[in-house]
Amino acid sequence: MEEPHSDLSIEPPLSQETFSDLWKLLPENNVLSDSLSPPMDHLLLSPEEVASWLGENPDGDGHVSAAPVSEAPTSAGPALVAPAPATSWPLSSSVPSHKPYRGSYGFEVHFLKSGTAKSVTCTYSPGLNKLFCQLAKTCPVQVWVESPPPPGTRVRALAIYKKSQHMTEVVRRCPHHERCSDSDGLAPPQHLIRVEGNLHAEYVDDRTTFRHSVVVPYEPPEVGSDCTTIHYNYMCNSSCMGGMNRRPILTIITLEDSSGKLLGRDSFEVRVCACPGRDRRTEEENFRKKGGLCPEPTPGNIKRALPTSTSSSPQPKKKPLDAEYFTLKIRGRKNFEILREINEALEFKDAQTEKEPGESRPHSSYPKSKKGQSTSCHKKLMFKREGLDSD
């Protein structure tokens, strides 16, 4: 028991003594003095040096302002709550004109003649001045000029809403189609109109009007051709929610010089749908019912109009028979017999024409074994009866 007491008298190890000495060196409240922490201000850059190093003025008023840490969450809070719809759906400050303008070069836009079959992917209605096409399908548009425009001329395609209450909104694709991986590497995902097979196409986002357009250089017609054809694609359906949302749109095609001066303008309505032929027939029929001018007929429309004309053809045959009698003097027995047979045949034909709808039903009700015999006897009896009546 005495050995432990003797151990207490032994001095602590060197490490413990060093720790205790260091602990005594600390000031009160465990705060280091200024002598132990030299100032670090000489290591910081001045505001002028920061501005010159960045090469630009972040605030735009000549000084660099420090963002307090306490204000960061307050400024970020409202940004998360407010969706800022103006940036996603901007309103244009101006509405471009869509009135046709041929200009001094006789600029016009034409389309190929097409029918209304179910298999068509693009069809144009001249009476409606409307193009019906499928999503992302080729739409050839012919550009006609009477005289060659100056070098550097460009052709621009721009889409706007047709109705006045929607004209200030920018036409763009719906969010679903914007996220689709169908980009060709040139067109931005929000652009509705694209140019197919032209590497010189330029897609423009106007910073003033926020509208989207696509510009291609004007190319003169090839040898043996009178026009230049541009192939456009429409990358969103007219019925897409969040996009056009069943609102009709117009496509404006303009001819511009190298400085952007307008040389010519033309426009047409566009409907992007799943069945262009069916929708064209429906709208043309509705247009006719409202008293509008009939559009130019197409082979498909002519074929569909034939059954209506054949169904109304039996109506002239239902005219009442002529009941007036005439007396004819004939010389010679042989001539009389010939004319009598002709007269009986004509009267039999008139009787069959008048009774044809009603007689077809009782004939079909006879048994198959006696059908041929009964009809032949019936005709002979009628023929004899008609002959007696004629005499």
UniProtKB/Swiss-Prot annotation:
The modification Omega-N-methylarginine is found at residue 331. The record marks 118 as: Interaction with DNA. The modification N6-methyllysine is found at residues 368, 370, 380. Residues 98-368 are annotated as: Interaction with HIPK1. This is Cellular tumor antigen p53. The modification Phosphoserine is found at residues 9, 15, 20, 33, 37, 46, 181, 267, 313, 390. Residues 357-361 are annotated as: Interaction with USP7. GO terms for biological process: cellular senescence; circadian behavior; DNA damage response; entrainment of circadian clock by photoperiod; negative regulation of cell growth; negative regulation of DNA-templated transcription; nucleotide-excision repair; oligodendrocyte apoptotic process. The modification Phosphothreonine is found at residues 18, 282. Zn(2+) binds at residues 174, 177, 236, 240. A motif (Nuclear export signal) lies at residues 337-348. Residues 323-354 are annotated as: Oligomerization. There is a cross-link at residue 384 (Glycyl lysine isopeptide (Lys-Gly) (interchain with G-Cter in SUMO)). Multifunctional transcription factor that induces cell cycle arrest, DNA repair or apoptosis upon binding to its target DNA sequence. Acts as a tumor suppressor in many tumor types; induces growth arrest or apoptosis depending on the physiological circumstances and cell type. Negatively regulates cell division by controlling expression of a set of genes required for this process. One of the activated genes is an inhibitor of cyclin-dependent kinases. Apoptosis induction seems to be mediated either by stimulation of BAX and FAS antigen expression, or by repression of Bcl-2 expression. Binds 1 zinc ion per subunit. The modification N6-lactoyllysine is found at residues 118, 137. It is linked to p53 is found in increased amounts in a wide variety of transformed cells. p53 is frequently mutated or inactivated in many types of cancer. Forms homodimers and homotetramers. Binds DNA as a homotetramer. Interacts with AXIN1. Probably part of a complex consisting of TP53, HIPK2 and AXIN1. Interacts with histone acetyltransferases EP300 and methyltransferases HRMT1L2 and CARM1, and recruits them to promoters. Interacts (via C-terminus) with TAF1; when TAF1 is part of the TFIID complex. Interacts with ING4; this interaction may be indirect. Found in a complex with CABLES1 and TP73. Interacts with HIPK1, HIPK2, and TP53INP1. Interacts with WWOX. Interacts with USP7 and SYVN1. Interacts with HSP90AB1. The modification N6-acetyllysine is found at residues 118, 303, 319, 371, 379-380. Keywords: Acetylation, Activator, Apoptosis, Biological rhythms, Cell cycle, Cytoplasm, Cytoskeleton, DNA-binding, Endoplasmic reticulum, Isopeptide bond, Metal-binding, Methylation, Mitochondrion, Necrosis, Nucleus, Phosphoprotein, Repressor, Transcription, Transcription regulation, Tumor suppressor, Ubl conjugation, Zinc. Residues 53-78, 284-320, 347-391 are annotated as: Disordered.
